[in-house]
């Protein structure tokens, strides 16, 4: 089944943001007898975060992180991680009786540099899909809202709401996939050993596209006779992957244009603002952009999209605890506020400040104003949280007092019964 002209890859990474069709593509590729594609291993994300644990860890999250980083800093962490990953992938392949594993994990856009350093020679398959269609799928499948009266486009309140959990982390991450993940993956198109697959062409001509990708991996495309959606039981047994594939009988293109009726004009406007008209055109979706314009949306310019990216990047850096002046491993908002007060400056992320310095239209004063407003809103959120905690503590004390009173009453009744 396999060619002998070049060594076959142990691991291939399938990249694409959530709801772009990665589950379908992985399923079709693993119909080749030498290829397996487990549902979303997330292994690279776990390895990249090695040493960072939940702040509730009883041993102390900051102690674990500092100690692990200190120890790993004395060795070649990348080579050690590579050995672990090779062992994990190899054991999975051996158990499956396959030769190449396709790691399909949509949020690998978050660790692309780590991915490249760990597996610089690994082939990549980059799946691109119309951002409007992705948004429609996020809306219909996960209920992700794209219109919010509480959070006007690119307003400072957006950042404060993101950090304080409104919208929920799941919704914010889904939006970050579009705002940060899509442009990050778009930059991978020219990378060596990268095959680009377009979702629209995949569902129009599945056999042709799968055979092309299989050949690009070094395998004989004749190994796949028909690209169908049978044998999806492995998805039913997993917590990950697109569950809709379980209901499919065949590959079809019905989902390519449904966004035109599923998204409102306001939602199309939001998607255009989040992604940017320039990126839509760059990725080849100018016809979709024109349809949205004909429907009534306007191109608000690069500044709006860049502002969204800065807001989400700042939120993302705060989540990771990597913002400037934020202690390593800090997971509590208290740590953020204390550092901000000590410095009497803005703890905006280094990556965001760097980006602002590179973009003349965004001045440092605007960044400081954005950060100052964010800190003020977060302080108010903290005060509200502390008030809520005080109320809950008072309720607990009242509950404990009531329990103690009941215990005394039980003792009194027991004593009266024994007399």
UniProtKB/Swiss-Prot annotation:
Keywords: Nodulation, Plasmid, Transferase. It comes from the Bacteria. Transmembrane segments: none annotated. It holds the Pfam family Sulfotransfer_3. Its EC number is 2.8.2.-. One of its GO terms (molecular function) is protein-tyrosine sulfotransferase activity. Signal peptide: none annotated. Required for the formation of sulfated nod factor. Proposed to transfer activated sulfate (PAPS) to the fucose of the nod factor. This is Nodulation protein NoeE. It comes from Sinorhizobium fredii (strain NBRC 101917 / NGR234). The gene is noeE.
């Amino acid at each position: 089944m396999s060619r002998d002209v070049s060594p076959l890859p142990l691991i291939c990474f399938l990249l694409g943001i959530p709801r772009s069709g990665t589950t379908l593509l992985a399923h079709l590729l693993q119909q080749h007898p030498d290829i397996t594609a487990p549902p979303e291993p997330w292994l690279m994300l776990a390895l990249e975060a090695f040493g960072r644990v939940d702040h509730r860890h009883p041993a102390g999250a900051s102690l674990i992180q500092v100690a692990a980083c200190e120890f790993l800093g004395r060795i070649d962490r990348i080579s050690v991680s590579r050995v672990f990953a090779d062992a994990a992938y190899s054991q999975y392949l051996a158990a499956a009786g396959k030769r190449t594993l396709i790691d399909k994990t949509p949020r690998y856009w978050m660790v692309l540099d780590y991915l490249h350093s760990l597996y610089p020679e690994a082939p990549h398959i980059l799946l691109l899909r119309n951002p409007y269609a992705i948004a429609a799928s996020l809306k219909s499948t996960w209920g992700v809202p794209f219109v919010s009266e509480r959070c006007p486009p690119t307003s400072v309140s957006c950042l404060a709401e993101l950090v304080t959990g409104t919208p929920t982390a799941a919704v914010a991450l889904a939006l970050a996939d579009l705002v940060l993940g899509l442009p990050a993956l778009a930059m991978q198109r020219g990378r060596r050993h990268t095959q680009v697959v377009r979702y629209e062409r995949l569902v129009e001509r599945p056999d042709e596209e799968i055979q092309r990708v299989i050949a690009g991996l070094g395998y004989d495309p004749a190994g796949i006779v028909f690209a169908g959606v049978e044998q999806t039981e492995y998805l039913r047994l997993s917590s990950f992957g697109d569950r809709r594939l379980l209901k499919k009988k065949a590959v079809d293109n019905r989902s390519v244009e449904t966004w035109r009726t599923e998204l409102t004009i306001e939602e199309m406007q939001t998607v255009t603002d989040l992604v940017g008209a320039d990126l839509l055109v760059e990725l080849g979706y100018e016809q979709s952009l024109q349809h949205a314009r004909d429907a009534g949306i306007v191109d608000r310019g690069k500044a709006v999209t860049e502002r969204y990216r800065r807001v989400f990047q700042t939120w993302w850096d705060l989540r990771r605890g990597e913002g400037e002046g934020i202690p390593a491993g800090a997971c509590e908002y208290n740590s953020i506020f204390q550092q901000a007060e000590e410095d009497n400056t803005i703890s905006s992320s280094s990556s965001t400040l760097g980006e602002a310095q590179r973009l003349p239209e965004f001045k440092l004063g605007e960044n400081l104003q954005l950060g100052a407003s964010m800190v003020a809103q977060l302080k108010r959120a903290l005060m509200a949280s502390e008030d809520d905690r005080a109320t809950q503590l008072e309720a607990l004390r009242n509950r404990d007092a009531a329990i103690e009173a009941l215990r005394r009453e039980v003792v009194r009744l027991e004593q009266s019964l024994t007399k």
